[in-house]
Design a protein with these regions (language model features):
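Short, glycine/charged-enriched hinge/interface segments at domain edges or termini
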Residues: 36-53, 106-274, 279, 418, ...
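Short glycine/threonine-rich loop/turn motifs
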Residues: 5, 252, 258, 267-382
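Conserved active-site and cofactor/substrate-binding residues in soluble primary-metabolism enzymes
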Residues: 47-54, 72-75, 79, 103, ...
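C-terminal terminal segments
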Residues: 34-37, 41-42, 100, 117, ...
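Short alpha-helix capping/helix-loop boundary micro-motifs
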Residues: 93-94, 130-135, 185-190, 435-445
């Protein structure tokens, strides 16, 4: 059902309902759909919206009471991207495990170059060469040097490395001339200079990125203990929905929410379980919800509002206590979102409009999965940008504004795509990010607007490089 925005228009309609004029008008209308729509508007006007912060607090605290646990498993390092560590990882060795050169050059004793100057150069004999991965049995004495590659082990007797660019090479690379002094330890990474044995590399709950996996590989570990993926049942409701790839009739639309939500679940550490499309029939929806209770979390798209065919919240209440704990959230889009617990399983009832469903999962689905996985989640890319136009906010609501990011002369600008149109998935697909604008109702002066030129923080949905 479409979201109904509270406004003066609604108040007028409700006043008319009480008066005879609209009663006679409604009697004159034979269409059941008109009657249903008026009833839905009346019910919506009495709906109290919960703030996002309070709704999330209620939902997560109730979810914790049921102690959802997904267990752990060992996996190979090559499968660890975007998985969550189930225990701390300690460094088993010093990294590097030996002193190594940070440059291509010559390993020497720093004392040998103590008196070197442009007009009083020091000559050293080159006695060996060490490539990365090799060692030298030679021990450097005064007046000697060993050619060394970046990353190679420092030979015995040497305490510094002089860069190849800072020497004069003579006699078929058998001698070098040095014209300046060099400090002890120059161009050398000491043993354990990066990581020390016993050091905590990564903590339990870390969301593993490419850099983390490289770090783990650098200390020789090939298998990890991680949390199992949260199994999330994903169900779309609506008699108008058709499966992508099927033939579309005149009164149907393709189901996009199920695929969008499944993709979001995967990205946020879950394993989506596709329960398909469910027609707007109470008994069928009940059976699907009972099937979904086998899994850890339930996402239901559609049927969250107050229309005649919006059965889902009532069924959640019937199936298991405490049932729906939040009905309606003060956010646009996504205000008809409901949150509940059925037989110990968290349930998010998302609006049928695609943008609303996206925002609702972003707001409640992500934190729920992170909570179950005992993680703060993956890094979130953000960009500060200047608005290119004014944006009107919904009173008493947190507004999620879709924007394009433009880059001009090194500066970033946020161009609003749409503050409305929750049914228009293209406005989300063509956006680079979202501005989360909290309504400020403190004090006598109330701001209903984000202003052109104002700096805003954009939560990026994709990487942005282009220069506009």
């Amino acid at each position: 059902m479409p979201e109904i925005i509270g406004s003066n228009l609604e108040k007028c309609i409700l006043m008319m309902v009480k008066g005879s004029a609209l009663r006679h008008l409604l009697k004159a209308k034979s269409s059941d759909s008109m009657s249903n729509r008026a009833q839905a508007m009346k019910m919506s006007s009495h709906r109290k919206y919960c703030s996002i912060s309070l709704a999330l607090k209620k939902f997560l605290s109730r979810s914790k009471l049921f102690g959802i646990s997904v267990g752990t498993e060992h996996i190979s390092l090559d499968k660890a991207t975007d998985r969550i560590l189930a225990r701390n990882i300690q460094c088993p060795i010093d990294i590097p495990p030996f002193q190594r050169s940070t440059v291509d050059g010559y390993a020497i004793r720093s004392s040998a170059a103590k008196g070197a100057a442009r007009n009083d150069q020091v000559v050293l004999n080159v006695i060996d060469k060490i490539n990365a991965g090799k060692d030298s049995r030679a021990k450097i004495r005064s007046g000697e040097a060993i050619a060394i590659a970046t990353g190679a082990k420092i030979p015995a007797g040497a305490d510094s490395v002089i860069m190849i660019e800072d020497v004069i090479i003579e006699d078929m690379r058998k001698k070098i001339r040095i014209s300046h002094r060099i400090d002890r330890g120059s161009n050398i990474t000491p043993r354990g200079g990066d990581l020390r044995k016993g050091q905590i590399l990564l903590k339990k709950g870390t969301w593993l990125t490419a850099a983390d996996i490289g770090l783990i590989a650098s200390v020789g570990k090939s298998r990890l203990l991680v949390y199992k993926k949260v199994k999330v049942a994903v169900l779309s409701t609506g008699s108008e929905l058709a499966e992508p790839g099927s033939k579309l009739d005149d009164a149907s639309i393709f189901d996009s929410n199920r695929f969008m939500l499944s993709s979001m679940v995967r990205k946020q550490g879950g394993e989506p379980i596709d329960l398909g499309i469910c027609k707007d029939e109470k008994s069928v929806i009940r059976a699907k919800i009972n099937q979904a209770l086998k899994f850890d979390v339930i996402l239901i798209s559609g049927g969250s509002s107050v229309g005649e065919k919006d059965y889902v919240p009532g069924l959640i209440n019937e199936i298991g206590k405490p049932g729906i704990i939040v009905s309606g959230v003060a956010m646009k889009p996504g205000s008809p979102t409901s949150l509940g617990i059925a037989n110990g399983k968290p349930v998010i009832v998302l609006p049928g409009y695609p943008v609303s469903a996206f925002v609702a999962f972003y707001t409640f689905g992500r934190p729920l999965l992170y909570n179950i996985l005992k993680s703060s989640g993956p890094p979130v890319a953000r960009q500060v940008a200047k608005l290119t136009s004014n944006v009107k906010l919904h009173r008493g609501m947190t507004t999620f504004v879709r924007v394009r990011i433009l880059r001009r002369h090194g500066c970033f600008f946020a161009k609003p795509v749409s503050a409305a149109g929750a049914s228009l998935l293209s406005t989300l697909a063509y956006s680079d990010g979202i501005v989360v604008a909290k309504y400020n109702n403190r004090g006598l002066k109330r701001e209903y607007m984000l202003h052109k030129g104002q700096n805003v923080e954009v939560v990026l949905l994709r990487e942005v490089y282009q220069e506009a």
